[in-house]
Curated annotation (Swiss-Prot):
The lineage of its organism: Eukaryota, Sar, Stramenopiles, Ochrophyta, Bacillariophyta. Necessary for the expression of RuBisCO. This is Protein CfxQ homolog. It comes from Trieres chinensis (Marine centric diatom). Keywords: ATP-binding, Chloroplast, Nucleotide-binding, Plastid. GO terms for cellular component: chloroplast. ATP binds at G71, S72, P73, G74, T75, G76, K77, T78. It is found in: Plastid, Chloroplast. The gene is cfxQ.
Length: 291
């Protein structure tokens, strides 16, 4: 039997990892985002097959693991980052499997000599896991000659290149400024193999997310409240600073407060469980979005 006939049981190797469980959780926890889920599955497949090839002595350059997540706030970028760190850990590409989320303030100092120690300290904490840099484009401020963000980028570039077996970096933020950021920093762009775009949620998807959020907290929408919330989401999507699932969560928090005040103002009556669970249309319609 030649070495080329050496075999490996794919299903057995797949079952040894928890990738199926992680991908299923991703499907359950995140509404929509079909193209994102598809890309994560593709990356997981590549990493698994690469591992099997190595086990059989087939050598090739390690796949690029650094990633870019672009999209509006509240579209699941951090959640997907967490799942990606789980997949990388299960397949042995990172040693610890933790995800460290940071922003510019965690990396860049305010005076000379302050940035390098800050950035190196963050990198030290992230080693063996995934470093998730949110709104990464704020690292680069070309209009300010005294800005120290470029120093953090230089250190980051070195680590992404020289310690890629110990750390995976995910750069995240709005698509347009991220594209400009990469244009201005081609060294960063060339080190990122996986660019994933996160689409905004539709009204229907956001309504489904709302119901899931409420169910977790043992609330439910009445039929009229569901109609009102659908109208709210459609209107809110057209307003500035809309943050998808994050904006919906904030709206539901306010609806819960209005529900509590409505019930509180009717004290003296006997309350049923249904009344404590139900969010009514008026709890939604009191929002200033309807003014």
């Amino acid at each position: 039997m030649s070495s080329m006939d050496t075999s490996v049981n794919l299903q057995e190797e797949y079952n040894k990892t928890e990738i199926a469980k992680i991908l299923n959780l991703l499907n359950e926890e995140l509404v929509g985002l079909v193209p994102v889920k598809s890309r994560i599955r593709e990356i997981a497949a590549l990493l698994l097959i690469d591992k099997l090839r190595k086990n059989l002595g087939i050598t090739a350059g390690s796949p690029g693991l650094h990633m870019s997540f672009t999209g509006s706030p509240g579209t699941g970028k951090t959640t997907v980052g967490l799942k990606m760190s789980d997949i990388l850990f299960q397949l042995g590409y990172i040693k610890k499997g933790h995800l460290l989320t940071v922003t510019r303030d965690d990396l860049v100092g305010q005076y000379i000599g302050h940035t390098a120690p800050k950035t190196k300290e963050v990198l030290k904490k992230a080693m063996g896991g995934v470093l998730f840099i949110d709104e990464a484009y704020y690292l680069y401020k070309p209009d300010n000659e005294r800005d120290y963000g470029s120093e953090a980028i230089e250190i980051l570039l070195q680590v992404m290149e020289n310690q890629r077996d110990d750390l995976v970096v995910i750069l995240a933020g709005y698509k347009e400024p991220m594209d400009k950021f990469y244009e201005s920093n081609p060294g960063l762009s060339s080190r990122i193999a996986n660019h994933i775009d996160f689409p905004d949620y539709t009204v229907e998807e956001l309504l489904k997310i709302s119901k899931m959020m409420l169910e977790e907290q043992q609330y439910q929408l009445t039929t009229q409240a569901e109609v009102a919330l659908t109208q709210y989401i459609a209107k809110r999507k057209e307003k500035p600073l809309f943050a998808n699932a994050r904006s919906v969560k904030n709206a539901l928090d306010r609806a819960r407060m209005r529900q509590a005040n409505r019930i509180f103002d009717s004290r003296g009556q006997i309350l049923t469980k249904k009344e404590l669970v139900n969010i009514e249309a008026e709890d939604i319609l009191q929002s200033t979005i309807f003014d």
